[in-house]
């Protein structure tokens, strides 16, 4: 190529590369569809409620150090607040086909996961264990360890051969052999120290659990003014979404309900096919752990809406 053409080409190439990269990363144009919604909104079936305040949950168990209370129950998940008093420990167990994960609301626990070095999970930690990997936890220190735990609905734990199963009404435990285990990867890590890594360290949130069954997403953002009530957010087909507030203050608008203002430890629940909007509120940062099944799950938005609300 003649030299006189090289200089103009050299000037143009960086712009072409930038355009190509932008095209690869740009979000595709949204598609229009008629999405089905029931005429009568899906109900809040017990124990599910629009808002469960942590203060009320703790008040119901005042004076007790060992307790469990189911806050969420859907086709896909059961979510429980569980408190273990000082010195208490779980048996070593595992779950057949799904990850179990939890957020530590208060206290400290020693977590032992087969194949990992034991670690201490304190306030704000997120912990997860893949399917068929034995694990146990033990409260350390002088105060109860309180966690919000999410696992597959309707599943009874399994136990290694050396452990004695805890009796479950209507179930028996039989001697078996099996193969195969879940694993950790670039997204699914044993734990996230939210305070150290995210709040102080500046790490981004994003997916903490992501596999073919579960998406548990850490969403952190500064507070914003309350949008118009005509800004509905989005809805999902055939599954509910729920959240635990990990930091700051948040506002939730759920179809058919008044505006919800939630704080750290509160549980918020949106039934399937109901419009819902979740945003950080106030002057600081707000963080929520959003739990949905079957990623990447479909979000239906209002025409012209900003995707991601």
Please annotate each region the language model reported.
Residues 90-92, 111-112, 129, 134-142, ...:
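Short beta-strand His + acidic residue motifs that chelate non-heme Fe in jelly-roll/DSBH
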Residues 115-131, 256-272:
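Short acidic-glycine-tyrosine-enriched beta hairpin
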Residues 83-84, 94-111, 220-221, 235-252:
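Short, conserved beta-strand element in jelly-roll/cupin
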Residues 8-18:
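Bacterial N-terminal signal peptides
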Residues 19-23:
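Sec/Tat signal peptide C-region and signal peptidase I cleavage site
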Residues 24-78, 91-92, 157-226, 232, ...:
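A short, N-terminal "cap"/entry segment at the start of jelly-roll beta-barrel domains
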Residues 142-159, 269, 283-301:
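A short hydrophobic beta-strand segment most commonly corresponding to one strand
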Residues 70-71, 90-96, 113, 138-140, ...:
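Short histidine-centered beta-strand/loop micro-motifs
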